[in-house]
Amino acid sequence: MAGLATFVVSLLLVTLCAHCIDPAGSVSIPSSCCMFFISKKVPENRVVTYQLLNGSVCPKAGVVFTTKKNQKFCGDPQLHWVQKLMKNIEARRKKVSPGVRAMSTKALVQRYPANSTSI
């Protein structure tokens, strides 16, 4: 009976130790990394933004695109259509930015026309 109890306790200790020890060289991959790339071209008007993930954090470099419906998919940054889509999104972003600034300045000027005094 003592032999059986010793065996059970030993087995329990080995099982606990096996779960506590982290194997050497284990790598945790962030959930935001691209593991698979979409194979077909996505219409440009559906995509609103992108995030470039380099190979230093993730095993594969990839581009995470976000659609208007907040769906995310990965593109291979080596593909021509992915590079073109990134460039077009940047162009849209730069095109919108100056207009937004100009409109906000114009709105401030129109909002307070009584600030100037005339003699």
Curated annotation (Swiss-Prot):
It holds the Pfam family IL8. Residues 1-26 form the signal peptide. GO terms for cellular component: extracellular space. Glycans are attached at residues 54, 115. GO terms for biological process: antimicrobial humoral immune response mediated by antimicrobial peptide; chemokine-mediated signaling pathway; eosinophil chemotaxis; inflammatory response; positive regulation of cell migration. InterPro entries: Chemokine_b/g/d, Chemokine_IL8-like_dom, Interleukin_8-like_sf. Its main location: secreted. PANTHER family: C-C MOTIF CHEMOKINE 24 (PTHR12015:SF100), SMALL INDUCIBLE CYTOKINE A (PTHR12015). This is C-C motif chemokine 24. It comes from Canis lupus familiaris. The gene is CCL24.
